[in-house]
Amino acid sequence: SCNSNEWDVTSDLNVDSVDPTIGLTPLAEAPHMDYAPLYWSVYGALRQQEKDASFPNIFTETDWDNAINYVANNLKSHGYDMLVTDGFASMSGDNGYMTRYSHTLKNDNSPEVQLSTIISKLNAKGLKLGVYDSPFWLHYTNPNAIIPGTDNITVGSLRYDSKKDKDIKHPTKNDQFGWVVTDHPGAEQYFEGFFKHYSDMGVKFIRMDFLSWYEDGMNYTD
């Protein structure tokens, strides 16, 4: 969860001289926080479109309105206070991080729904937004976006560069995602900026996936 500013989601995005998490109590271990969040996910609707090969998968503002009303009227009283995105729709942003989610028409050139719009709709019903994302992923629209806290280091420079990056376990494989190469300059600031971005926006939960892919290039089922 990123609903606590205990970690380094401040305006100081300089490289840390020491690990900022040392000595902190994880939020999940804090009093009265020993439970998993209860939320409704867009996964089912988008996964069905994937199975039907009805591309691009979309979840429109009207879909959000219907889902939000359903959760508010039927699930909120049972503790469900959040709706969460998934990975089966477009994820983009011009500042290096996700600010838009899902096209609005079955057309890759159609507008996308602004996360800020979704958050406003949720707030009006006393609900929260969670996102499916990872600081290891790059899904920007503008590769020249400057990483906050750096001296003009661009987001695009964090990608794998075959001319410089030689210690690669599977050099002939194609990436299913754009991954951050963590020893590139600016990677730490990008990671800290990732959590600050969502914290500032009002996102309250981040679902992360496929971390094992980053470690060794393999899925846990392989």
Give residue spans per PLM region:
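N-terminal Sec signal peptide cleavage junction
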Residues: 2-4
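Conserved structural scaffold segments of CAZyme catalytic domains across common CAZy folds
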Residues: 7-130, 134-140
